[in-house]
Amino acid sequence: MGSSKLKRAIGAVKDQTSVGLAKVGGRSSSLTELEIAVVKATRHDDYPAEDKYIREILCLTSYSRNYVSACVATLSRRLNKTKNWSVALKTLILIQRLLTDGDRAYEQEIFFATRRGTRLLNMSDFRDASQSDSWDYSAFVRTYALYLDERLDYRMQGRRGKKKSGGGGGGDGDSGEEDDHRGTSNDIRSKAIVVKSKPVAEMKTEKIFNRVQHLQQLLDRFLACRPTGNAKNNRVVIVAMYPIVKESFQLYYNITEIMGVLIERFMELDIHDSIKVYEIFCRVSKQFDELDPFYGWCKNMAVARSSEYPELEKITQKKLDLMDEFIRDKSALAAQTTKSSSKRSNKSEEEESKTEYIQENQEDLNSIKALPAPEQKEEEEEEEKMETKKDVEEVVSRQDQEGDLLDLTDEAGVTAGTVGDSLALALFDGVVGTESASGPGWEAFNDNSADWETDLVRSATRLSGQKSELGGGFDTLLLDGMYQYGAVNAAVKTSTAYGSSGSASSVAFGSAGSPAASMLALPAPPPTANGNRNSPVMVDPFAASLEVAPPAYVQMNDMEKKQRLLMEEQIMWDQYNRSGRQGHMNFGQNQQQQYYQLPYSMGPYSYTPRY
């Protein structure tokens, strides 16, 4: 307790010293009285300032703009020197009262005034270290000064906007009427001017966004001014809270008015503006949730009348969800429309490019001009070339018709088609006809030729090359094949086969006869017909394949067949030895008895011949 009394005494001494210095300063009486009134309104005690000193300051500064500047300078020195939270808070309360009830010049002077190189109301570095429990008071001083600074900035921007719009109220200042009752004696004419701000419903959306942003920032500064700790029960703090709580009521009304306008325009706004509105509503919802308990504390502390507090309309989460859903649907629809518009634009661009291309082609076609007529020399040269080509073709055709009588290869008469036909006939039973090597192949007699006698003789000399065809489309190759069938079979029978052995009288045909022949041996040359070597008998061209050993499964089948034939032959010889009869009649009668008297044991294998 002794330390607190000592501090109070020291504070009282400082106040008396400041008053004495103001009296001895040698200034005018008005400035001296103004400085003394400021010192008395901001004493070092824990009691609120008396209202008479504040009214005296307002009265002294209402005469001249110089007194306003002197008052602001005195307040700046007071804030700069003091380290006591009570003096600093009382000075801020005086500034707030001057801004509200004083002349407009206070706003400009305080707005442009500096303290330690910064703005006058920038108290972020303030700290009272004189007491251990002064931290809560220092924090309230800092937040209170920050609120006043933000409020002053908001009002100055509103005034600048009004000046730019020519006084038509297009700025973001306070709504309602503003009377110039705070004007000085030099502004008597301006007192009659009543400035009306533009209604929010008539503002543009961008200006509404700008204004609500400033109001939300100012409301955040007010919410930060809620005292904590020991500052909640201090009388000076409660007196400082009263004016800003009254101002917060107007802030709430302005924000709700803007919210109503935004809700009306929400359906017509773009997606970008709709997102801004959604963000504004989310922020306002959080601010109203914090404002409700703050107003409850203010009511309990009797900061203002309970009837003066507004009824807060909170923004529910359901409303925010509806807004979010609407924005999502609108963005999805916009995306679809942009895709369709892009497709249409692409199609239109393609059509335009096609039309441009067609127009360019038409222009090119229209720009084509007739070429000049060719000269007579070129025509004569072309005619000479054509004549030389015709002469060469005639010489070549004559050589083809005459042929070379000494040519033994007969290349003139043999073509690729005839060679292919001869090779194909060699695979079958036809005799390849050989033409005479005396000249070209046979051609039909030309009746239109001039030298018909020589042509007749030439055609008669090549009668052997004619293709004789009988009437009715009968093929001579078929007839020759019928006559040569026996000779071909004889040649096949006489040809050697793989692994042939046995007697000539063996019933197993092909298993006995000629001795075994060597594998991969070509057959003997074909026999001639009637000793004429020029007319050979055709033999199977694939006879050489019989000399090659077949696969294993083919040889097994052949061996089984030979075994069955050998069994039949032995049965027939046994029957002949017993009864002396031959033929198949006796064989059929004794078939059952002969089966069990087989001299050879064949195992489980049994065979019944079928005739």
UniProtKB/Swiss-Prot annotation:
**Keyword Membrane in record:** yes
Where are the annotated segments for Disordered?
A: 158-184, 337-406
InterPro entries in the record = ANTH_dom, ANTH_dom_sf, ANTH_N_plant, AP180-like, ENTH, ENTH_VHS
| GO (cellular component) term, any one | Golgi apparatus
ENTH domain segment(s): 26-162
What's a Pfam family in this record?
Answer: ANTH
Annotated Basic and acidic residues bias: 386-401
Subcellular location as annotated: Membrane, Clathrin-coated pit; Golgi apparatus; Cytoplasmic vesicle, Clathrin-coated vesicle
Q: Does the keyword Membrane apply?
A: yes
Q: What is this protein's record name?
A: Putative clathrin assembly protein At4g02650
Q: Give the UniProt record's GO annotations in the biological process aspect.
A: clathrin coat assembly; clathrin-dependent endocytosis; pollen tube growth; protein localization to plasma membrane
Q: Which UniProt keywords apply?
A: Coated pit, Cytoplasmic vesicle, Endocytosis, Golgi apparatus, Membrane
GO MF terms here are:
1-phosphatidylinositol binding; clathrin binding
